[in-house]
């Protein structure tokens, strides 16, 4: 069965500046997500700095309107509490007045990964705040390019053959696919500039997704282990 992991984050208020969300704000987000009935298989609410992230597993696929609306409603509930408590930057990442089908382009950051679930499935969510959009460029490079850091690049045939990096230029919005090992110098040159060039996706050469990474100016990152 195909499972989708959706991670959607937003800054809707912080205590004393960009520090952390209040307990009341987190609880408002959690209550909204918990009230979603059987829409989700499971969920987790966390934060990094003053960014609240909602981790959801479901069977609706990526870019699903119901899933994105649930996250939007949860952040609106958190915003209401932030205003009542006088938190800093209440609702600042909600750039639109109403939901319009997908949170992309509306302020929140989104990372989603759809895959066939294995018997023992694991994934990791990387979260960061107040940093470069490409802050995870180097660790991802170490994982999928540097055999000194990951012996799987030697013993796993599909990884040994090289993977495909999708790189986004966040200044002009262009995207390029770079393949290992032929494009290694170009990839390394791009990843030296995390303020402009960002890993958007990594796939095997057969097209199997490995991680889904942050979009421009947003985090988080999902890594399927």
Q: Where on the chain are the PLM-derived regions?
A:
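Catalytic-site or vestigial catalytic-site microsegments of nucleotide-handling domains
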Residues: 4-16
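Conserved long alpha-helical elements within nucleotide-processing catalytic cores of c-di-GMP signaling
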Residues: 13-30
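A broadly used, surface-exposed interaction patch
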Residues: 30-37, 54-113
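Short, glycine- and small/hydrophobic-rich beta-strand elements in well-ordered beta-sheets
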Residues: 37-48
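Short acidic-rich active-site patches of cyclic nucleotide enzymes
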Residues: 49-53
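Extended alpha-helical scaffolding regions
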Residues: 108-174
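Eukaryote-biased recognition of electropositive, low-complexity segments
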Residues: 188-194, 198, 202-214
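Conserved small/polar residues in nucleotide/adenosyl-binding loops
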Residues: 215-221
């Amino acid at each position: 069965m195909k499972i989708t992991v959706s991670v959607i984050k937003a800054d809707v208020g912080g205590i004393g500046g960009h520090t952390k969300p209040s307990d009341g704000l987190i609880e408002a987000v959690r209550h909204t997500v918990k009230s979603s009935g059987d829409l989700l298989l499971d969920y987790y609410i966390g934060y990094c700095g003053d960014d609240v992230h909602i981790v959801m597993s479901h069977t609706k696929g990526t870019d699903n309107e119901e899933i994105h609306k649930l996250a939007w409603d949860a952040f609106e509930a958190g915003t209401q509490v932030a205003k009542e408590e006088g938190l800093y930057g209440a609702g600042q990442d909600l750039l639109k007045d109403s939901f319009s089908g997908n949170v992309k382009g509306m302020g929140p950051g989104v990372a989603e990964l759809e895959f066939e679930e294995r018997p023992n499935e694991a994934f990791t969510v990387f979260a960061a705040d107040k940093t470069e959009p490409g802050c995870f460029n180097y660790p991802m490079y170490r994982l999928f390019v540097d055999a000194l850091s990951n012996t799987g690049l030697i013993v796993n045939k599909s990884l040994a053959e090289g993977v495909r990096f999708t790189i986004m230029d966040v200044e002009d919005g262009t995207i390029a696919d770079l393949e290992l090992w032929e494009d290694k110098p170009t990839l390394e040159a791009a990843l030296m500039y995390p303020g402009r060039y960002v890993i958007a996706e990594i796939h095997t050469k057969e097209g199997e997704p490995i991680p889904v990474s942050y979009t421009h100016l947003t985090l988080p990152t999902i890594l399927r282990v």
